[in-house]
């Protein structure tokens, strides 16, 4: 790897091999240089793995690495979790054919661009895309997503070596809103902590960071940091259709505090004659606590977005970063599906729409189940949008 984050010392495109890659490093990889990456540490449920899927980079994470890999010809099979070295002619032909079949499937799916995302009985679903930044927008548009259901704003912080200013954030949010041309853009406020670390914030190392000082807890503890981001988002809302969602909510008190800070930000902007749009406020449902009081939370916000990755981790008491637990980490667990159903029911009782923005939203084996539960929106990796649309149109 090069001296700068995300750079690769090679003229030719390569398969990048590393002991580990942090989300902040992954998001800066140059896709023209990195065909794929393989790491020894990590888990397929980590944010690094999720980013690889968002960026459409084949990856193997948490695998044994043979020695002396540099310069070798290799095949990365992300579907089967295989690293194949010095493949014979038969294996090469097999993967060439597989690649051609995949390209053919992509071409067929392109016929669904411009079509409604609705079931055979006419039930419409809002099908949005998850992004980490501006670089993902081309894929969102190419795959005809109806909007952005999750803009992971933390990558503005992870990609920088200092705190992004209000102006820097405003320019990015405004550009995304304008590019989406009136389509919904839901920005998740700063969600760092756990495996997403920002050195310049000087956060203390924790024994159990997934349950520690992270996400909304940081924002409410450091209101000026929070207000800077909120000001930037509200200013950008004048130029498009923006919603805001807040991560890691566990109580009504948090929402009330958030609303107080939002009111202060809006008052400040008004006092300075700065225009802003009508912004929908929602929360992530990613803790069992939020699920259990979702009837009360629904009275306070306009939408829920279910983060199935963390909801699975916290419900099953299972570290999503630990590769030894991958076979036990089961988002299909009946407890998870019951929690999703409960959240939908409680949301709808109070006219609160409900979506899923976790990886489970793109699980085609559950699409019909989610529709029967009454899910209003699915937000998925851009490359999965047309596949999910195809599945929904056959239900």
Question: What residue ranges belong to the model's regions?
Answer:
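Glycine/charge-rich, flexible interdomain linkers and switch-proximal surface loops
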Residues: 6-28, 274-284, 291, 364
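Conserved alpha/beta-domain cores
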Residues: 106-395
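Acidic, glycine-rich flexible loop/linker segments
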Residues: 8-13, 18-143
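Low-complexity, highly charged intrinsically disordered N-terminal segments
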Residues: 1-5
């Amino acid at each position: 790897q090069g001296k700068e984050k995300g750079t690769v010392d090679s003229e030719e495109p390569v398969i990048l091999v590393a002991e580990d890659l942090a989300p902040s490093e992954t998001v800066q990889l140059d896709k023209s240089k990195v065909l794929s990456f393989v790491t020894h540490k990590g888990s397929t449920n980590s944010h690094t793995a999720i980013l690889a899927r968002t960026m459409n980079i084949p990856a193997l994470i948490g695998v044994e690495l043979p020695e002396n890999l540099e310069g070798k010809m290799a095949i990365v099979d992300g579907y089967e979790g295989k690293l194949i070295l010095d493949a014979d002619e038969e294996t090469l032909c097999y993967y060439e054919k597989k690649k051609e079949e995949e390209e053919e499937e992509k071409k067929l799916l392109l016929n669904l661009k411009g079509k409604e995302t609705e079931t055979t009985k006419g039930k419409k679903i809002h099908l949005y895309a998850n992004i980490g930044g501006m670089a993902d927008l081309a894929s969102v548009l190419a795959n005809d997503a109806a909007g952005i259901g999750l803009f992971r704003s933390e990558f503005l912080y992870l990609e920088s070596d200092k705190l992004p200013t209000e102006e820097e954030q405003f320019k990015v949010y405004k550009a995304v809103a304008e590019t989406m041309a009136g389509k919904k853009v839901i920005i998740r406020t700063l969600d760092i902590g756990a495996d997403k670390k920002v050195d310049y914030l000087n956060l203390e190392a924790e024994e159990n960071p997934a349950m520690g000082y992270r996400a909304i807890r940081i924002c409410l503890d450091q209101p000026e940091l929070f207000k800077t981001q909120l000001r930037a988002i509200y200013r950008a809302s004048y130029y498009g259709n923006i919603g805001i969602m807040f991560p890691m909510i566990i109580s009504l008190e948090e929402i009330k505090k958030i609303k107080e800070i939002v009111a202060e930000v809006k008052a400040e902007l008004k006092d300075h004659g700065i225009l802003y749009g009508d912004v929908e406020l929602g929360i992530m449902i990613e803790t069992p606590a939020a699920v259990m009081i979702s009837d009360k939370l629904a009275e306070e916000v306009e939408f829920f977005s279910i983060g199935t990755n963390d909801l699975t981790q916290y419900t099953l008491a299972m570290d999503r970063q630990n590769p030894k637990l991958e076979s036990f980490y089961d988002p299909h667990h009946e407890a998870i599906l019951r929690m999703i159903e409960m959240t939908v029911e409680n949301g709808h009782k109070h006219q609160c729409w409900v979506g899923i923005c976790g990886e489970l939203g793109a699980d085609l084996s559950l699409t019909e189940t989610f529709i029967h539960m009454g899910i209003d929106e699915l937000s998925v990796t851009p490359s999965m949008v047309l596949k999910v649309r195809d599945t929904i149109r056959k239900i």
